[in-house]
Amino acid sequence: MAATPVPTALGAYRLLLRATRIAFHGDFTTLHAARAEARKQFDQHRELGVDTPMRIQHAVETAEILRTNVVQGIKVSDAGEDTDRYELRIHEHIERGDNDTIKTAGKNKKVKVAVGKTCSNTQS
């Protein structure tokens, strides 16, 4: 079984830029701001250090979150409506979950989530 390759700083940076392009497609202002922030963070930590592998891993994880969990909404203005409506741009990379926790919570069961725990560590 082959080990997962560890990306270089340049590879992580390019992965982050691709993720911003996917997540913020059509929103030039946010796309530009996200890319500027990524560049600023990489420029600030240009020198190799003890924490370089952690920073590279952080960039890879950030790219994954941007690509799979960020959904943008565009405000749709229809004449005659009193409420605000948004059209969501859901693309093929968005992580789609199941509704198992909603179904079990609807049966008088409470899903407990402790502070500091992730969804994968919850107990029902």
UniProtKB/Swiss-Prot annotation:
Q: What is the lineage of its organism?
A: Eukaryota, Fungi, Dikarya, Ascomycota, Pezizomycotina
What InterPro entries has UniProt attached to this entry? Complex1_LYR_LYRM7, MZM1/LYRM7
**Where is it localised?**
Mitochondrion matrix
GO MF term list? protein folding chaperone
Q: What family does this belong to?
A: Belongs to the complex I LYR family. MZM1 subfamily.
Task: From the UniProt record, report the name of the gene that encodes this protein.
Answer: MZM1
Give the quaternary structure.
Answer: Interacts with RIP1.
Q: Which GO terms describe its biological process?
A: mitochondrial respiratory chain complex III assembly
Keywords, A to Z, come to: Chaperone, Mitochondrion, Transit peptide
**What is this protein's function?**
Assembly factor required for Rieske Fe-S protein RIP1 incorporation into the cytochrome b-c1 (CIII) complex. Functions as a chaperone, binding to this subunit within the mitochondrial matrix and stabilizing it prior to its translocation and insertion into the late CIII dimeric intermediate within the mitochondrial inner membrane. Modulates the mitochondrial matrix zinc pool.
| Coiled coil regions in record | none
Record's GO cellular component, any one?
mitochondrial matrix
Highest taxon in the source lineage: Eukaryota
PANTHER family for the chain: COMPLEX III ASSEMBLY FACTOR LYRM7
Q: What is this protein called?
A: Mitochondrial zinc maintenance protein 1, mitochondrial
Source organism of this protein record: Blastomyces gilchristii (strain SLH14081) (Blastomyces dermatitidis)
